[in-house]
């Protein structure tokens, strides 16, 4: 039954007993009342229970083929990279769920290094993996890191981003994925150890070693530098999957030089280095090539899985524009649909956009900038017009910088006509 305050004859919350004057809202039901504070408490309890149910059991881990199928929905091409990532991720979480030890055999963690040109899908692959597995995910930029005691970010700040992504749930963060981009930028300046201190190169590699391998790290909850009088969050990195990626510009020449020494001999087929594309060359990658590039042996040793990504050609870029679940063309179609306008990209226009991205050497990452340039004026004008039914993008919009064609309707005569935006 509804509760009343006997003294003031006021309605009261049936759960906590507070009067309507003591709370912001009082929601009435059949013979019962509940205040906004109790509703909020109920939501928190339900959310906690749902979060507890998110832990993956061995049967819940997607199989490699299932992981690959989901990656296919978001990432075009890169078939070999997807296979390698699917297997590595499946084995990683299988190892966690089985307790890292089976019949006295200790299963070691397999962190991943991804090599591929700018805009080839490294970050997208890593973030999609985290989405598939429903685990916290954090991205860090290796170029902002320095070793402890110097201006820049400590490596522990990477772990803070993961904790924040897990809403400060440490147990959840300890099963997350961290992607460190631009890892090639912290290569030391030469293959040989230097007597001068390299605080943003070799020093960072040294600082990353422990968290890559597995340690209990002390993470400052507010970020920034550590100092003795602050409290720390203790985070065990043993089960965190680290994926590092970079373009590694110039590593193809290191590989070609190594291969070139071995093709000289009786009956050997001599192939000019220039005849091999970078994708073919990267397939010959060995850990020794990463050492030659400037990564230290201990760092390379903690990245046993090497995944190579190819540069995207015109056909792949066109497919990226139209096929994935979150394809750019689909996004802009939906944006214009909200203004009551249909959007059409001609096939030649899609090819011209892909060619422009290749010319700019930006890969898939540069596609959005090109499409945004094309659509900016249209998206500025359309909300103020109610006579446009369709927008058509032709190749001349990209090649000759013309405006997209707008199909308008003369409401008095109900006739359609085309005009430039």
Curated annotation (Swiss-Prot):
ATP binds at residues 117-124. InterPro entries: AAA+_ATPase, ATP-dep_Clp_protease_ClpX, ATPase_AAA_core, Clp_ATPase_C, Clp_protease_ATP-bd_su_ClpX, ClpX_bact, P-loop_NTPase, Znf_CppX_C4. One of its GO terms (cellular component) is HslUV protease complex. GO terms for biological process: cell division; proteolysis involved in protein catabolic process. Transmembrane segments: none annotated. Gene3D superfamilies: 1.10.8.60, ClpX chaperone, C4-type zinc finger domain, P-loop containing nucleotide triphosphate hydrolases. Zn(2+) binds at residues 13, 16, 35, 38. Residues 1-54 form the ClpX-type ZB domain. ATP-dependent specificity component of the Clp protease. It directs the protease to specific substrates. Can perform chaperone functions in the absence of ClpP. Component of the ClpX-ClpP complex. Forms a hexameric ring that, in the presence of ATP, binds to fourteen ClpP subunits assembled into a disk-like structure with a central cavity, resembling the structure of eukaryotic proteasomes. This is ATP-dependent Clp protease ATP-binding subunit ClpX. It comes from Desulfitobacterium hafniense (strain Y51). The lineage of its organism: Bacteria, Bacillati, Bacillota, Clostridia, Eubacteriales.
């Amino acid at each position: 039954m509804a509760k009343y305050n006997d003294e003031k004859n006021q309605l009261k919350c049936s759960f906590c007993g507070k009067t309507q004057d003591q709370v912001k809202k009082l929601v009435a039901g059949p013979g019962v009342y509940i205040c906004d504070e109790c509703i909020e408490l109920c939501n928190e309890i339900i959310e906690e229970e749902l979060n507890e149910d998110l832990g993956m059991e061995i049967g819940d881990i997607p199989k490699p083929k299932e992981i690959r199928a989901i990656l296919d929905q978001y990432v075009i091409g890169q078939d070999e990279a997807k296979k390698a990532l699917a297997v590595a991720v499946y084995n990683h979480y299988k190892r966690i769920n089985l307790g890292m030890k089976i019949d006295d055999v200790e299963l070691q963690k397999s962190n991943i290094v991804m090599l591929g040109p700018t805009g080839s899908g490294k970050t997208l692959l890593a973030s999609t993996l985290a989405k598939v597995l429903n685990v916290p995910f954090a991205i860090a930029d290796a170029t902002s890191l320095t070793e402890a005691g110097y201006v820049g970010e400590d490596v522990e700040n990477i772990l803070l981003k993961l904790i924040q992504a897990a809403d400060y749930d440490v147990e959840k963060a300890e099963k997350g994925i961290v992607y460190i981009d631009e890892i090639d930028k912290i290569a030391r300046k030469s293959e040989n150890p230097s007597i001068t201190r390299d605080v943003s190169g070799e020093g960072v590699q040294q600082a990353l070693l422990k968290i890559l391998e597995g340690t209990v790290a002390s993470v400052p909850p507010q970020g920034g530098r550590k100092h003795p009088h602050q409290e720390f969050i203790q985070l065990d990195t043993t089960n965190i999957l680290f994926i590092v990626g970079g373009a590694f510009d110039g590593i193809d020449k290191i590989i070609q030089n190594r291969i070139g020494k071995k093709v000289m001999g009786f009956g050997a087929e001599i192939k000019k280095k220039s005849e091999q594309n970078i994708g073919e060359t990267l397939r010959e990658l060995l850990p020794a090539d990463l050492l030659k590039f400037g990564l230290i042996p201990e760092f390379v040793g903690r990245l046993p899985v090497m995944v190579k990504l190819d540069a995207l050609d015109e056909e792949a870029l066109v497919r990226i524009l139209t096929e994935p679940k979150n394809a750019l063309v689909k996004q802009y179609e939906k944006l214009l649909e909200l203004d009551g306008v249909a959007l059409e990209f001609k096939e030649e226009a899609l090819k011209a956009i892909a060619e422009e991205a290749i010319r700019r050497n930006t890969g898939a990452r540069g596609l959005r900038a090109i499409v945004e340039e094309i659509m900016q004026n249209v998206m500025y004008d359309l909300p103020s017009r109610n006579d446009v039914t369709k927008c058509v993008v032709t190749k001349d919009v990209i090649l000759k910088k013309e405006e997209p064609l707008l199909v308008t309707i003369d409401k008095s005569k109900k006739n359609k006509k085309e005009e430039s935006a």
